[in-house]
Amino acid sequence: MKPFIHNDWWPVLEPEFEKPYYQELRRFLVEEYQHYRIDPDMYHIFTAFEWTPFSQVKVVILGQDPYHNPGQAHGCSFSVLPGTEIPPSLVNIYKELQDDLGVQPVQHGYLKHWADQGVLLLNSVLTVRDGIKTANTHRGHGWEQLTDSAIEKLSARPEPVIFILWGSAARSKIKLIDTQTNIVLQSPHPSPLSAYRGFFGSKPFSKTNIALTSLGETPIDWQLPQQVTISDESTSDTH
Protein backbone atom coordinates (compact mmCIF):
# COMPACT_ATOMS: atom_id res chain seq x y z
CA MET A 1 0.00 0.00 0.00
CA LYS A 2 1.34 3.42 -0.94
CA PRO A 3 1.83 5.57 2.18
CA PHE A 4 -0.64 8.41 2.58
CA ILE A 5 0.70 9.64 5.90
CA HIS A 6 4.20 10.85 5.19
CA ASN A 7 6.07 10.34 8.45
CA ASP A 8 6.57 7.72 11.16
CA TRP A 9 2.83 7.46 11.83
CA TRP A 10 2.60 5.35 8.68
CA PRO A 11 4.21 2.15 10.04
CA VAL A 12 2.27 2.64 13.28
CA LEU A 13 -1.13 2.88 11.60
CA GLU A 14 -0.65 0.95 8.34
CA PRO A 15 -1.96 -2.33 9.85
CA GLU A 16 -5.23 -0.55 10.65
CA PHE A 17 -5.69 0.50 7.03
CA GLU A 18 -5.53 -3.16 5.99
CA LYS A 19 -8.35 -4.25 8.31
CA PRO A 20 -11.93 -4.90 7.16
CA TYR A 21 -13.39 -2.06 9.25
CA TYR A 22 -11.22 0.48 7.44
CA GLN A 23 -12.17 -0.92 4.05
CA GLU A 24 -15.82 -0.47 5.05
CA LEU A 25 -15.06 3.05 6.26
CA ARG A 26 -13.36 3.89 2.99
CA ARG A 27 -16.35 2.70 0.97
CA PHE A 28 -18.63 4.78 3.19
CA LEU A 29 -16.45 7.87 2.69
CA VAL A 30 -16.36 7.48 -1.09
CA GLU A 31 -20.17 7.58 -1.11
CA GLU A 32 -20.32 10.47 1.34
CA TYR A 33 -17.83 12.64 -0.54
CA GLN A 34 -19.72 11.99 -3.78
CA HIS A 35 -23.14 12.97 -2.41
CA TYR A 36 -22.49 15.48 0.39
CA ARG A 37 -20.16 18.27 1.34
CA ILE A 38 -17.80 16.70 3.88
CA ASP A 39 -15.44 18.39 6.32
CA PRO A 40 -12.52 18.48 6.03
CA ASP A 41 -11.80 17.97 2.34
CA MET A 42 -10.37 14.54 1.64
CA TYR A 43 -6.81 15.84 1.30
CA HIS A 44 -6.73 17.09 4.88
CA ILE A 45 -8.29 14.19 6.77
CA PHE A 46 -4.97 13.16 8.30
CA THR A 47 -3.46 16.61 8.90
CA ALA A 48 -3.09 16.02 12.65
CA PHE A 49 -0.81 13.05 11.97
CA GLU A 50 1.09 14.91 9.24
CA TRP A 51 1.77 17.89 11.49
CA THR A 52 2.95 15.93 14.54
CA PRO A 53 4.95 12.76 13.85
CA PHE A 54 4.49 9.80 16.20
CA SER A 55 7.97 10.05 17.73
CA GLN A 56 7.54 13.78 18.39
CA VAL A 57 4.19 13.68 20.21
CA LYS A 58 4.48 15.08 23.73
CA VAL A 59 0.86 16.13 24.30
CA VAL A 60 -2.50 14.99 22.88
CA ILE A 61 -5.52 17.30 22.88
CA LEU A 62 -8.41 15.01 22.04
CA GLY A 63 -11.51 16.32 20.29
CA GLN A 64 -14.68 14.63 19.05
CA ASP A 65 -15.44 15.29 15.37
CA PRO A 66 -14.50 18.14 13.02
CA TYR A 67 -16.19 21.52 12.90
CA HIS A 68 -19.04 21.30 10.40
CA ASN A 69 -19.34 24.90 9.25
CA PRO A 70 -17.97 25.71 5.77
CA GLY A 71 -14.25 26.37 5.56
CA GLN A 72 -13.36 25.71 9.19
CA ALA A 73 -12.18 22.12 9.55
CA HIS A 74 -8.75 21.10 8.31
CA GLY A 75 -8.03 17.87 10.12
CA CYS A 76 -6.98 19.03 13.60
CA SER A 77 -9.01 19.17 16.80
CA PHE A 78 -10.19 22.66 17.82
CA SER A 79 -8.09 24.37 15.10
CA VAL A 80 -9.63 26.30 12.19
CA LEU A 81 -8.17 27.75 9.04
CA PRO A 82 -7.05 31.40 9.04
CA GLY A 83 -9.73 33.80 7.90
CA THR A 84 -12.62 31.86 9.43
CA GLU A 85 -14.49 32.77 12.59
CA ILE A 86 -13.02 31.42 15.81
CA PRO A 87 -15.51 28.86 17.18
CA PRO A 88 -16.94 29.36 20.68
CA SER A 89 -15.03 26.41 22.18
CA LEU A 90 -11.73 27.81 20.95
CA VAL A 91 -12.66 31.28 22.24
CA ASN A 92 -13.03 29.66 25.66
CA ILE A 93 -9.73 27.80 25.26
CA TYR A 94 -8.06 31.14 24.59
CA LYS A 95 -9.75 32.64 27.67
CA GLU A 96 -8.47 29.84 29.88
CA LEU A 97 -5.01 30.09 28.30
CA GLN A 98 -4.90 33.80 29.13
CA ASP A 99 -6.10 33.25 32.70
CA ASP A 100 -3.72 30.32 33.18
CA LEU A 101 -0.50 31.65 31.67
CA GLY A 102 -1.18 35.25 30.67
CA VAL A 103 -0.95 34.29 27.01
CA GLN A 104 -2.53 36.92 24.79
CA PRO A 105 -5.40 35.77 22.54
CA VAL A 106 -4.92 36.02 18.78
CA GLN A 107 -7.43 36.85 16.07
CA HIS A 108 -7.22 33.46 14.35
CA GLY A 109 -7.77 29.84 15.31
CA TYR A 110 -4.88 28.20 13.47
CA LEU A 111 -3.05 26.02 16.01
CA LYS A 112 -0.13 24.77 13.92
CA HIS A 113 2.40 26.41 16.25
CA TRP A 114 1.27 23.99 18.96
CA ALA A 115 1.37 20.99 16.63
CA ASP A 116 4.90 21.86 15.52
CA GLN A 117 6.02 21.55 19.15
CA GLY A 118 4.57 18.09 19.68
CA VAL A 119 0.89 18.73 20.48
CA LEU A 120 -1.19 16.20 18.55
CA LEU A 121 -4.58 17.78 17.79
CA LEU A 122 -6.57 14.59 17.33
CA ASN A 123 -10.30 14.16 16.83
CA SER A 124 -11.75 10.73 17.57
CA VAL A 125 -13.82 10.95 14.35
CA LEU A 126 -11.96 12.51 11.42
CA THR A 127 -14.81 13.52 9.08
CA VAL A 128 -18.35 14.94 9.30
CA ARG A 129 -21.06 16.19 6.96
CA ASP A 130 -21.00 19.94 6.47
CA GLY A 131 -24.04 21.91 7.61
CA ILE A 132 -26.45 22.69 10.41
CA LYS A 133 -27.25 19.82 12.78
CA THR A 134 -24.73 17.49 11.14
CA ALA A 135 -22.49 16.87 14.16
CA ASN A 136 -21.62 13.21 14.68
CA THR A 137 -22.93 12.15 11.25
CA HIS A 138 -19.79 10.04 10.70
CA ARG A 139 -19.68 8.60 14.20
CA GLY A 140 -19.78 4.81 14.41
CA HIS A 141 -18.42 4.12 10.93
CA GLY A 142 -14.88 3.10 11.88
CA TRP A 143 -12.91 6.23 12.64
CA GLU A 144 -13.05 5.51 16.36
CA GLN A 145 -11.22 2.21 15.86
CA LEU A 146 -8.42 3.96 13.99
CA THR A 147 -7.99 6.81 16.46
CA ASP A 148 -8.34 4.47 19.45
CA SER A 149 -5.44 2.51 17.99
CA ALA A 150 -3.40 5.72 17.68
CA ILE A 151 -4.09 6.54 21.34
CA GLU A 152 -3.13 3.02 22.44
CA LYS A 153 0.10 3.13 20.42
CA LEU A 154 1.05 6.48 21.97
CA SER A 155 0.19 5.20 25.43
CA ALA A 156 2.51 2.22 24.93
CA ARG A 157 5.48 4.31 23.84
CA PRO A 158 8.50 4.33 26.19
CA GLU A 159 8.31 8.14 26.30
CA PRO A 160 5.34 9.35 28.38
CA VAL A 161 2.60 11.41 26.76
CA ILE A 162 0.32 13.99 28.38
CA PHE A 163 -3.29 13.39 27.36
CA ILE A 164 -5.66 16.36 27.70
CA LEU A 165 -9.24 15.06 27.82
CA TRP A 166 -11.99 17.70 27.72
CA GLY A 167 -15.58 16.53 28.05
CA SER A 168 -17.21 13.16 28.58
CA ALA A 169 -16.49 11.81 25.09
CA ALA A 170 -12.76 12.48 25.43
CA ARG A 171 -12.67 11.33 29.04
CA SER A 172 -14.18 7.99 28.02
CA LYS A 173 -10.90 7.28 26.20
CA ILE A 174 -8.98 7.03 29.48
CA LYS A 175 -9.55 3.27 29.31
CA LEU A 176 -7.14 3.19 26.35
CA ILE A 177 -4.34 4.94 28.27
CA ASP A 178 -1.80 3.44 30.65
CA THR A 179 -2.17 5.96 33.46
CA GLN A 180 0.81 4.47 35.31
CA THR A 181 3.26 5.67 32.68
CA ASN A 182 1.41 8.58 31.05
CA ILE A 183 -0.19 11.74 32.46
CA VAL A 184 -3.91 12.47 32.00
CA LEU A 185 -5.49 15.90 32.54
CA GLN A 186 -9.30 15.88 32.57
CA SER A 187 -11.95 18.58 32.77
CA PRO A 188 -15.35 19.50 31.32
CA HIS A 189 -15.44 20.55 27.66
CA PRO A 190 -14.63 24.17 26.69
CA SER A 191 -17.98 24.47 24.91
CA PRO A 192 -20.13 27.39 26.16
CA LEU A 193 -22.54 24.72 27.43
CA SER A 194 -20.03 23.31 29.90
CA ALA A 195 -17.02 25.64 30.25
CA TYR A 196 -18.32 27.14 33.49
CA ARG A 197 -18.72 23.69 35.04
CA GLY A 198 -15.01 23.25 35.56
CA PHE A 199 -13.12 23.94 32.35
CA PHE A 200 -12.47 27.52 33.38
CA GLY A 201 -9.91 27.42 36.15
CA SER A 202 -8.64 23.93 35.30
CA LYS A 203 -5.24 25.32 34.19
CA PRO A 204 -4.43 22.59 31.65
CA PHE A 205 -1.68 24.57 29.95
CA SER A 206 0.42 25.32 33.02
CA LYS A 207 -0.16 21.77 34.31
CA THR A 208 1.04 20.41 30.98
CA ASN A 209 4.22 22.46 31.11
CA ILE A 210 4.89 21.50 34.73
CA ALA A 211 4.52 17.85 33.73
CA LEU A 212 6.78 18.25 30.70
CA THR A 213 9.45 19.90 32.83
CA SER A 214 9.24 17.05 35.34
CA LEU A 215 9.81 14.63 32.46
CA GLY A 216 12.85 16.55 31.27
CA GLU A 217 11.01 17.82 28.19
CA THR A 218 10.86 21.36 26.83
CA PRO A 219 7.61 23.11 27.83
CA ILE A 220 5.16 24.13 25.12
CA ASP A 221 5.18 27.76 24.01
CA TRP A 222 1.41 28.25 23.96
CA GLN A 223 1.60 31.80 22.57
CA LEU A 224 0.38 31.62 18.99
CA PRO A 225 1.81 33.99 16.38
CA GLN A 226 -0.34 37.02 15.65
CA GLN A 227 -0.05 36.53 11.89
CA VAL A 228 -0.23 33.17 10.14
CA THR A 229 -0.25 31.80 6.63
CA ILE A 230 -1.57 28.41 5.58
CA SER A 231 1.19 25.87 5.14
CA ASP A 232 1.00 22.87 2.86
CA GLU A 233 -0.80 20.88 5.52
CA SER A 234 -1.25 17.51 3.95
CA THR A 235 -1.40 15.64 0.69
CA SER A 236 -3.01 12.55 2.14
CA ASP A 237 -6.15 10.86 0.92
CA THR A 238 -8.37 7.99 2.02
CA HIS A 239 -6.72 5.06 0.21
From Swiss-Prot:
SUPFAM superfamilies: Uracil-DNA glycosylase-like
Predominant subcellular localization, coarse grouping: cytoplasm
Residue stretches spanning the membrane: none
Entries under InterPro entries matching the protein: UDG_fam1, Ura-DNA_Glyclase_AS, Uracil-DNA_glycosylase-like, Uracil-DNA_glycosylase-like_sf
Its EC number(s): 3.2.2.27
Gene Ontology cellular component terms for the protein in this record: cytoplasm
PROSITE patterns, per the entry: U_DNA_GLYCOSYLASE
GO terms assigned for molecular function: uracil DNA N-glycosylase activity
Annotated SMART domains: UDG, UreE_C
Active site: 65 (proton acceptor)
A Pfam family assignment: UDG
Biological function: Excises uracil residues from the DNA which can arise as a result of misincorporation of dUMP residues by DNA polymerase or due to deamination of cytosine.
Protein name per Swiss-Prot or TrEMBL: Uracil-DNA glycosylase
Organism from which the protein derives: Levilactobacillus brevis (strain ATCC 367 / BCRC 12310 / CIP 105137 / JCM 1170 / LMG 11437 / NCIMB 947 / NCTC 947) (Lactobacillus brevis)
Encoding gene per record: ung
